[in-house]
Design a protein with these regions (language model features):
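A domain-level signal for the structural core that forms small-molecule/cofactor-binding pockets
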Residues: 2-114
């Protein structure tokens, strides 16, 4: 925990090495001080086909899934930092966005908890 899942247009992977992109999001999330390094997970899904801005414009959207308990201010801070970093890396990409969702402690289970 947390999980950051990047959805992007396929062309993004030609603009920047995917591993570098994942590392930038990872490092930005870690820099907030909210998460332990070994708990952060970042994944990427690229889409060959999408309809954005009425056409095939490039985009990046990050789905941030974090354990409940963070303040709205903390969630806004991490959102702003990740979008700022992505905007620095991809200044010509017209759509860069993020949303943060809370996991509920009561319903989250992984195999180490069994």
């Amino acid at each position: 925990m947390p999980h950051f899942i990047l959805d992007c247009s396929e062309n993004i992977l030609e603009l920047k090495d995917p591993k570098e992109l994942l590392e930038e999001v990872f490092d930005t999330a870690f820099s907030t001080g909210l998460f332990k390094r070994d708990a952060i997970k970042v994944r990427l899904n690229s889409f060959k086909y999408s309809l954005v801005l009425g056409g095939d414009s490039d985009f990046i959207h990050v789905f941030g899934n974090i354990m409940e308990g963070r303040t709205e201010m903390q969630k806004e801070d991490i959102s702003r930092k990740i979008v700022t970093k992505l905007n620095q890396l991809f200044p010509d990409v017209p759509i860069i966005s993020i949303n943060i969702r809370d996991f509920e402690k009561s319903s989250y289970i992984n195999k180490t908890m069994l």
